[in-house]
Amino acid sequence: MRLTEVALVVQGRIRRFFAVGVLAVIMLGGCSGKERKNFEAGKALLNEGKYAEAVEAFDKAIEAHGSNSIRGLEIDILRYRAEAEYRAGDYKAAEHSYRLLTSADENRSEYMDMLAIIYTKLSNTDMDINIDNAIEMYDKAAKQDDKSELHINAGITIAEYYEDMYDKKMDATYLDSAEEFLEKLLKETGRKNAKVLAVYAKHMSKREDYDKALEAVDEGIALLEKKKLTKSEDETLKSLMFSRGSCYEYKSDYNKALEAFNAYIEKYGEDESVSHEVAFLKARIR
């Protein structure tokens, strides 16, 4: 799962947290003017994409809070600071912030999922962290019966790590690990999450098992085709429709492949990738 997509999920969770307003209004009412000013400035900078400046503002707000314990408004500031650090690509700093948050609420699955994502990104770049740390955090979140979009994204991030390692080292054991983790995700979601099915379909195509890939594609499309889609769901459907055409092409069923790509073009328009596929297929069908 890519940085922007995960960050949007985190940002949405934070906004919903404040929309509830149960504790936020009380705590904001008791904070200092300097603390409030820096907190609001940090949120504005975060929304503008000025992540480093946002972190500085949140640090000033925490300093103004003046408490030696992690509680109250300071937790909310830390949540925003952690997001800003993550979106800035400062994963080590984000890890520190989420570990602080976990020390205040060790059972909050959101923090575990973000640590799973961060540990995945730090694997192979930090000698003290490896993919097993990410899986441990993911499993802890799963034990909280976590079925959130963020949890799904954490699992996909781990699976994609294994696929990236395969691409770098061409060691099939990485593909085995990716498949094992994706099957775990399919089981957790009861094969009812289109995003997981889309990633699984691409993986099975890489393994040249096009029948299993098509099965996942058909399941994923069936989950989405009759509902009003969010932006994320529409991107997933787009991926599934392209995968359908690719699978039929690899199976040498060129007529079905062309039909699938034409359906893709009808819905999403023509781009360079699909134009190349269509040209190839038309040449073959002749």
Description of each model-found segment:
Residues 34, 74, 108, 115, ...:
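Residues that mark the junctions of alpha-helical repeat units in TPR/alpha-solenoid scaffolds
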Residues 30-80, 87:
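N-terminal leader/linker segments that initiate helical-solenoid repeat arrays
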Residues 63-75, 103-111, 141-151, 184-191, ...:
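Flexible helix-coil transition and linker loops at the boundaries of alpha-helical arrays
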Residues 73-76, 80, 114, 153-157, ...:
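Canonical tetratricopeptide repeat
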